[in-house]
């Protein structure tokens, strides 16, 4: 071990090694969280200490600070990054052992957007139709194709097969999933036909170039939608993801009027893209897609 490795130099060293072993998105997250940790160390005059002198107590105090100022989930994610970085330091003999590995995650309540009521959905669509038609089309890709917001951000003109009514969707693992485009959406995107195949469907000014990180794209559309939410006094429990939950719930309940539960699952998996039955069932439970009929007579 080299006693001359300061906290800052050791953290920078570990980050540099991680740069080529994780995805760009993950590395950006690592860099952001480690910069917060470095600021914490500097504010307490710990930055020039040897990395081996940073204690479990120091790290716990930092994590407690993250928890107080954000959420259990953010605290746990920060812990995971620190654990990965300190594991790299241990593997490269900059520290004797990884003290972060002894720190446990804390229980975090699942954060899931609520579904919209029919009245809320109607009000949102009406307002977007009047004020922001590009945002409305963005939302319709989430609603009618059951895409995640970041998947909509990735869509380019070349991903649309107008003749076959098909859509190529790039998942986070870079694999391409093919989905059908329902007729009610296909009719609305005919204006895109013939445009530069490399253009993105959604940029700040409509179809066009937009070469920034996809997380920043997603954040842009979330902030744009927040103006609609604020105008309708919708709280933080509602967001773009809520449309996916809302329309999958609608589809599930409509299918259940005709098919058995098993048949409904089979049809739904083809549409939503869930790869396993258990994943679909868990998702449907989480969004309360199926509710019981009135059971008042059972309580009499």
Model-derived segments and spans:
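Conserved tyrosine-mediated DNA breakage-rejoining catalytic core shared by Y-recombinases
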Residues: 145, 154-191
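Active-site/catalytic core of tyrosine-dependent DNA strand-transfer enzymes
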Residues: 182-235
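Short basic/aromatic active-site micro-motif
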Residues: 235-255
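Basic, Lys/Arg- and aromatic-enriched nucleic-acid-binding interface segment
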Residues: 95, 107-114, 118-149
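N-terminal core-binding DNA-recognition domain of tyrosine recombinases/integrases
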Residues: 12-28, 34-112
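Short, polar N-cap/turn motifs at the start of nucleic acid-interacting alpha helices
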Residues: 159-162, 257-284
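A short, glycine-centered helix-capping/turn motif at helix boundaries
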Residues: 93, 131, 141-154, 254-259, ...
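Catalytic-site neighborhood detector that most strongly recognizes the C-terminal catalytic loop/helix
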Residues: 170-174, 272-300
């Amino acid at each position: 071990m080299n006693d001359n490795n300061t906290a800052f130099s050791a953290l920078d060293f570990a980050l540099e090694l991680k740069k080529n072993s994780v995805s760009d998105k993950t590395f950006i997250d690592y860099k952001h969280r480690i910069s917060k940790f470095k600021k914490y160390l500097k504010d307490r005059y710990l930055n020039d200490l040897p990395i081996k002198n940073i204690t479990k107590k120091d790290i716990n105090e930092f994590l407690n600070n993250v928890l107080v100022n954000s959420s259990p989930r953010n605290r746990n994610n920060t812990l995971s990054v620190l654990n990965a970085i300190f594991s790299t330091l241990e593997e490269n003999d900059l520290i004797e052992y990884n003290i972060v590995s002894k720190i446990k995650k804390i229980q975090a309540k699942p954060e899931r957007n609520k579904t919209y009521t029919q009245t809320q959905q109607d009000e949102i669509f009406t307002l977007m139709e009047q004020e922001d038609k590009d945002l409305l089309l963005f939302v319709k890709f989430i609603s009618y194709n059951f895409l995640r917001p970041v998947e909509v951000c990735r869509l380019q003109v070349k991903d649309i097969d107008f003749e076959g009514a098909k859509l190529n969707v790039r998942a986070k693992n870079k694999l391409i999933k093919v989905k059908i485009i329902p007729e009610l959406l296909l009719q609305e995107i005919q204006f895109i036909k013939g445009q530069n195949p490399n253009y993105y469907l959604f940029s700040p000014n409509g179809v066009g170039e937009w070469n920034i990180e996809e997380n920043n794209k997603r954040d842009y559309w979330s902030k744009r939608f927040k103006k609609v939410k604020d105008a309708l006094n919708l709280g933080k429990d509602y967001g773009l993801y809520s449309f996916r939950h809302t329309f999958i719930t609608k589809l599930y309940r409509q299918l259940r009027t005709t098919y058995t539960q098993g048949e409904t699952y089979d049809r739904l998996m083809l549409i939503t893209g869930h790869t396993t039955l258990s994943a679909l069932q868990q998702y449907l439970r989480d969004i309360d897609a199926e509710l019981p009929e009135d059971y008042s007579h059972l309580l009499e």
